[in-house]
C-alpha cells in the first residue's frame, strides 16, 4: 500500500476561472485544506498554493498550481522533485468530461485522455504516468468543438450541487486514500452517486 504524500488539485488561476468546471480539482483540494485546517499560501518556488498537514506522523502536502492548466506539471514536478515524492505517492484531482456530474472515481496510471493538465504532469514527471487520479465528473457538452467553452464555464446550480456531493464522497474516503488503502477507498467511493 503506497501512502499519499502529495494531493494536487488542478485548475486555472484568477477570479475569472473561479468556480468553473475545469477547477473541480482545485475545489477538492480547497475542501481538503478546510477539513484539515490547513492554510494554503502562495509559494513561488513551487508555482502554486501550498500547504501541509500531519497524518499519522508523516507530512502530507497540498498543492494547487497557480500556473495555467496546461503548465500544471511545472508546479507538480517542482514540489515532487524537491521533496523526493514518487509519482505513485501523488494524487491528482481533476475534472472529468467522460463522467456525469455527481460521480467521482479513483484510478492509478493511464493516459491523459485529452486533459491538458494531466498531459503536462506526465511530461514533467519524465513520462511517468503512474500517479493516482481522483476524477470528478463534470459531464460532456456533446460535441468536441464545445468542450473548451464548456470546461471554462460555470455550471448551473443544480450541476454544481452534484459536483459538491461528489467532492463530499471523496472527502469521506480521505482516510483510506491517505493510508494508501486504495481497494477500500475505491469500493466505497465507486458505490456512491449524487442525487438532485
From Swiss-Prot:
GO biological process: protein quality control for misfolded or incompletely synthesized proteins; rescue of stalled ribosome
EC number of this enzyme: 3.1.1.29
Compartments, as annotated in UniProt: Cytoplasm
Main location, first listed in the record: cytoplasm
Site residues, Discriminates between blocked and unblocked aminoacyl-tRNA: 12
Pfam families in the record: Pept_tRNA_hydro (PF01195)
Binding residues for tRNA: 17, 68, 70, 116
Alphabetical list of Gene3D superfamilies matching this protein: Peptidyl-tRNA hydrolase
MF-aspect GO terms: peptidyl-tRNA hydrolase activity; tRNA binding
Family: Belongs to the PTH family.
Protein name as it appears in the record: Peptidyl-tRNA hydrolase
Lineage of origin: Bacteria, Pseudomonadati, Pseudomonadota, Gammaproteobacteria, Pseudomonadales
Name of the gene encoding the protein in the UniProt record: pth
Amino acid at each position: 500500500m503506497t501512502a499519499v504524500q502529495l494531493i494536487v488539485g488542478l485548475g486555472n488561476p484568477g477570479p475569472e476561472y473561479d468556480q468553473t468546471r475545469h477547477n473541480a480539482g482545485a475545489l477538492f483540494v480547497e475542501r481538503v485544506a478546510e477539513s484539515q485546517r490547513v492554510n494554503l499560501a502562495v509559494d513561488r518556488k513551487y508555482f502554486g498554493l501550498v500547504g501541509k498537514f500531519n497524518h499519522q506522523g508523516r507530512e502530507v502536502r497540498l498543492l494547487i498550481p497557480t500556473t495555467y492548466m496546461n503548465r500544471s506539471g511545472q508546479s507538480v514536478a517542482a514540489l515532487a522533485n524537491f521533496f523526493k515524492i514518487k509519482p505513485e505517492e501523488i494524487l491528482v484531482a481533476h475534472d472529468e468530461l467522460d463522467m456525469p456530474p455527481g460521480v467521482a472515481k479513483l484510478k492509478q496510471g493511464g493516459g491523459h485522455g485529452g486533459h491538458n493538465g494531466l498531459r503536462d504532469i506526465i511530461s514533467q514527471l519524465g513520462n511517468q504516468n503512474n500517479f493516482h487520479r481522483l476524477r470528478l465528473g463534470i459531464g460532456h457538452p456533446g460535441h468536441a468543438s464545445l468542450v473548451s467553452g464548456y470546461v471554462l464555464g460555470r455550471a448551473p446550480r443544480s450541476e454544481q450541487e452534484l459536483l459538491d456531493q461528489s467532492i463530499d464522497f471523496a472527502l469521506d474516503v480521505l482516510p483510506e486514500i491517505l493510508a494508501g488503502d486504495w481497494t477500500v477507498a475505491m469500493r466505497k467511493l465507486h458505490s456512491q452517486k449524487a442525487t438532485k
